[in-house]
Amino acid sequence: DLITNSYTRGKPRHVTSWRNLRTDVCKKSPGKCIHNGCFCEQDKPQGNCCDSGGCTVKWWCPGTKGD
């Protein structure tokens, strides 16, 4: 779809728009899946996420900084 295709430059296809990303909350347990196609890293379960291919994504999952 348009959302996915507009952000593919060498990255995995499962990329979500910021609008959809903000509606999801990262689980506190490391390795737990979250709805935007990321999972939490073992060493940074409070926010830093990897995509399902294991590449670190340089953003913090929504809902983690204050909870």
Swiss-Prot record:
Cell compartment(s), UniProt: Secreted
Main localisation: secreted
This protein's domain notes: The cysteine framework is XII (C-C-C-C-CC-C-C).
Domain of life: Eukaryota
Keywords: Disulfide bond, Neurotoxin, Secreted, Toxin
Single GO term (MF): toxin activity
PTM notes: Contains 4 disulfide bonds.
GO CC, any one term: extracellular region
Name of protein: Conotoxin Cal12.1p2
TM spans (from-to): none
Tissue specificity statement from the Swiss-Prot or TrEMBL entry: Expressed by the venom duct.
Annotated propeptide span(s): 1-21
Coiled coil: none
